[in-house]
From Swiss-Prot:
Oligomer status and interactors: Homotetramer. Interacts (via C-terminus) with calmodulin; forms a heterooctameric structure (with 4:4 KCNQ1:CALM stoichiometry); the interaction is calcium-independent, constitutive, participates in the proper assembly of a functional channel. The interaction with calcium-free CALM controls channel trafficking whereas interaction with calcium-bound CALM regulates channel gating. May form a functional heteromultimeric channel with KCNQ3. Interacts with HSP90AB1; promotes cell surface expression of KCNQ4.
Catalytic function, reaction form: K(+)(in) = K(+)(out)
Protein name (Swiss-Prot/TrEMBL): Potassium voltage-gated channel subfamily KQT member 4
Chain spans, region C-terminal assembly domain (tetramerization): 546-650
Intramembrane sections: 271-292
Binding site for a 1,2-diacyl-sn-glycero-3-phospho-(1D-myo-inositol-4,5-bisphosphate) 2: 220, 235, 330, 333
Residue sites binding a 1,2-diacyl-sn-glycero-3-phospho-(1D-myo-inositol-4,5-bisphosphate) 1 per the record: 93, 172, 219-220, 225
Phenotype for residue 298 to T: No effect on inhibition by potassium channel toxin SsTX
GO process annotations (BP): inner ear morphogenesis; potassium ion transmembrane transport; potassium ion transport; sensory perception of sound
Record entry for activity regulation: Two molecules of phosphatidylinositol-4,5-bisphosphate (PIP2-I and PIP2-II) are essential to activate KCNQ4 channel by inducing the coupling of the voltage-sensing domain (VSD) and the pore-forming domain (PD). Upon channel activation, PIP2-I and PIP2-II disrupt the VSD-calmodulin/CALM interaction, causing the release of CALM from the VSD which triggers the opening of the gate. Calcium suppresses KCNQ4 channel current through calcium-bound CALM C-terminus. Therefore CALM acts as calcium sensor that controls channel activity. ML213 potentiates KCNQ4 channel.
Length: 695
């Protein structure tokens, strides 16, 4: 029977009808027994889960003709590239112990420079020339080998591979300087060894080309880049200072030339005056030219005081620019350290967001964990190992067959017996060797039969489209490769052992034979637990990433701490000012009132306080209204009590309603005035008298 295609162990939601891009997850691996007894070769899958063609070569040693030679050549090529990359990093990007070699080269170059200087002194000329000749030989050998190795190691970069790439690398400025110094050294050595005095004297000046060797010490040009960036960043300030200083120099030199040209021969030309102005304004002061007239001295003093300030400005601008640039580089390095924690925090936050149960449409994180979780086959083997550990290293079948003395309590819990191969129940020893699909099928059939002992007859089991016949499923040599987590309404697997029971409560062998190997944990029970565990893992990883990111936000120097405290202090002052404004608005004291209090003026009267829109004015107004209402209620209650005591209608008309104090009710005006109350009282007395006469 044709083998069904492997199914995906999906942790995410089941795929819908619409096609979507998915990662192929794990499939249940075949057991060693299945590989030994199976007739056909297992299906081989690629990295993305697609089946490989039958004729594809097998990976590993001996997978084809010439594979050993190919592997040796590949390993040699890897070692070659690794060595080339290592040499390039040592020469071009030194770190750690690689600086030892560059320090050695610097000492050689500096020694050669010192000997070149000593060779110009008559007393040390002979000794310096002999030492310099030996050192030049060493320098030629070292620099020649280094130049060749540099050109060779540049092949690790893509742009410098091949002959054209090597030529492009040789045209770099520092490589050109190395080549010029090497040729000059060879020429000097050749002229010195031939003994040609004329050639030696002519090429002696070429020794000072070795000064260029000091330039090559900074191979990456970091100092020049730093200087260029500082000059470019402060170009406007430098141009302004240089322009004003140049104007001061021209005017000072011209005026001093006009004042000194007749009386002083040192200022016979404008060029001599410019030389004097340059030496004076730059605060060098050689003293070779000085003004003699008082007019020239006054002009020189005035322009010196004015011009020196502008000539000294570029030094301060460059110094502050260098300091700011270095601080910016340190800050940039500190910010670069935050890049990885920030990326990890964003990734952890997104994965935590995507693992929320309410967002079932986000499946990428579930597929990721689906690909790294162990297969159900490994999980079944793990449960078998746990069971054997509980049974003292024996399989469940061996535990059942072990002889037990009569009357002695059983040491191990009884297990189910093995049935015939055609039945749907299996002994635990064989069920541990089965694939997860067979175990799921077995558990589902046992739940269907129930306690009515229907397991003795082979029942008809509903099978999935990818399932096989029962006879084939019972064979341990035919193991399914995978099973889907998403078939939740289908077959359930037994994945956990029952707890141990005591000897008294243990069922007999007949009952054990009737009861099959059932379990309490199913795929439906596993999936929520697995997702909950993954969700908790994502929460922990998010909290860890958040803590690490907060650690990188800490200030790294004292200046940052001061800036942080100053910013916090300003924020606190702003909050206090806002709070004070709100308190003044509630109390009813505005900015003008506060200024008046500070000056010692008298505060506003009570009437002004009542008329204010502030909270205090509103409270005073409400209190006045409440007092007015209480006074009116007292008057009405007194009037009513007097009417009840008199008991006659005549007394009701005779009683005069007291008038209300207008001062008390200044803030509240009743809809009924006192005149209306008196009129209503008279009307009430007339109506009562009429009613008594009618009676």
């Amino acid at each position: 029977m044709a083998e069904a295609p492997p199914r995906r162990l999906g942790l995410g939601p089941p795929p819908g009808d619409a096609p979507r891009a998915e990662l192929v997850a794990l499939t249940a691996v075949q057991s060693e027994q299945g590989e030994a007894g199976g007739g056909g070769s297992p299906r081989r899958l690629g990295l993305l889960g697609s089946p490989l063609p039958p004729g594809a070569p097998l990976p590993g040693p001996g997978s084809g003709s010439g594979s050993a030679c190919g592997q040796r050549s590949s390993a040699a090529h890897k070692r070659y590239r690794r060595l080339q990359n290592w040499v390039y990093n040592v020469l071009e990007r030194p770190r750690g112990w690689a600086f030892v070699y560059h320090v050695f080269i610097f000492l050689l170059v500096f020694s050669c420079l010192v000997l070149s200087v000593l060779s110009t002194i008559q007393e040390h000329q002979e000794l310096a020339n002999e030492c310099l000749l030996i050192l030049e030989f060493v320098m030629i050998v070292v620099f020649g080998l280094e130049y060749i190795v540099r050109v060779w190691s540049a092949g690790c970069c893509c742009r410098y591979r091949g002959w054209q790439g090597r030529f492009r690398f040789a045209r770099k400025p520092f490589c050109v300087i190395d080549f010029i110094v090497f040729v000059a050294s060879v020429a000097v050595i050749a002229a010195g060894t031939q003994g040609n005095i004329f050639a030696t004297s002519a090429l002696r000046s070429m020794r000072f080309l070795q000064i260029l060797r000091m330039v090559r010490m900074d191979r990456r040009g970091g100092t020049w880049k730093l200087l260029g960036s500082v000059v470019y960043a402060h170009s406007k300030e430098l141009i302004t200072a240089w322009y004003i200083g140049f104007l001061v120099l021209i005017f000072a030199s011209f005026l001093v030339y006009l004042a000194e040209k007749d009386a002083n021969s040192d200022f016979s030309s404008y060029a001599d005056s410019l030389w004097w102005g340059t030496i004076t304004l730059t605060t060098i002061g050689y003293g070779d030219k000085t003004p003699h007239t008082w007019l020239g001295r006054v002009l020189a003093a005035g322009f010196a005081l004015l011009g020196i300030s502008f000539f000294a400005l570029p030094a301060g601008i460059l110094g502050s620019g260098f300091a700011l640039k270095v601080q910016e580089q340190h800050r940039q390095k500190h910010f670069e350290k935050r890049r990885m924690p920030a990326a990890n925090l964003i990734q952890a936050a997104w994965r935590l967001y995507s693992t929320d149960m309410s967002r079932a449409y986000l499946t990428a994180t579930w597929y990721y964990y689906d690909s790294i979780l162990p297969s159900f086959r490994e999980l079944a083997l793990l449960f078998e190992h746990v069971q054997r550990a509980r049974n003292g290293g024996l399989r469940p079948l061996e535990v059942r067959r072990a002889p037990v003395p009569d009357g002695a309590p059983s040491r191990y819990p009884p297990v189910a017996t093995c049935h015939r191969p055609g039945s749907t129940s299996f002994c635990p020893g064989e069920s541990s060797r089965m694939g997860i699909k067979d175990r799921i099928r077995m558990g589902s059939s046992q739940r269907r039969t129930g306690p009515s002992k229907q397991h003795l007859a082979p029942p008809t089991m509903p099978t999935s489209p990818s399932s096989e016949q029962v006879g084939e499923a019972t064979s341990p040599t035919k193991v399914q490769k995978s099973w889907s987590f998403n078939d939740r309404t289908r077959f359930r697997a037994s994945l956990r052992l029952k707890p141990r029971t005591s000897a008294e409560d243990a069922p007999s062998e007949e009952v054990a034979e009737e009861k099959s190997y059932q379990c309490e944990l199913t795929v439906d029970d596993i999936m929520p637990a697995v997702k909950t565990v993954i969700r908790s893992i994502r929460i922990l990883k998010f909290l860890v990433a958040k803590r690490k990111f907060k650690e990188t936000l800490r200030p790294y120097d004292v200046k940052d701490v001061i800036e942080q405290y100053s910013a916090g202090h300003l924020d606190m002052l702003g909050r206090i000012k806002s709070l004070q404004t709100r308190v003044d608005q509630i109390v009813g004291r505005g900015p003008g009132d506060r200024k008046a209090r500070e000056k010692g003026d008298k505060g506003p009267s009570d009437a002004e306080v009542v008329d204010e829109i502030s909270m205090m004015g509103r409270v005073v107004k409400v209190e006045k209204q409440v007092q007015s209402i209480e006074h009116k209620l007292d008057l009405l209650l007194g009037f009513y009590s007097r009417c009840l005591r008199s008991g006659t209608s005549a007394s009701l008309g005779a009683v005069q309603v007291p008038l209300f104090d207008p001062d008390i009710t200044s803030d509240y005006h009743s809809p009924v005035d006192h005149e209306d109350i008196s009129v209503s009282a008279q009307t009430l007395s007339i109506s009562r008298s009429v009613s008594t006469n009618m009676d």
